[in-house]
């Protein structure tokens, strides 16, 4: 599901959450160790979202696909995961706002999963969590020049890697899959 597809779904259904925020919530819950299927996903969404139960029920098939897409991205051995954000055709100020919404959603999802800062195993993951919290406060006061675009791209890449790091720190071996080894003969 693309950012634009999710945005349209949420607008049609009348959700209070933005596409970036909702994807962040789902990824945060995943990073916090939750694996949600069927009614567990529905109940988690009811607990995390401000939107009405009927809206969530109407959109549940699409939200289930988004959940599966997010889990697949976070567990991909090629590190294919990306936060769901608007594309380059969107003005930079709106992309920065969406990034702040995604990071706040991610933090909310982590909190809803029961994760606390003490749960993280490494200093790197704890630092990444602190950086994500700082990005959640991001604003835009630039003029949209190339330098601003480069800064945004670097933040987006950092956010992608930080989310993968936190997820992998807390993931079970079943989430990551069997380790591959290379043997020299």
Language-model-detected regions and their locations in the chain:
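Domain-length accessory/inserted modules outside core catalytic folds
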Residues: 1-103, 107-185
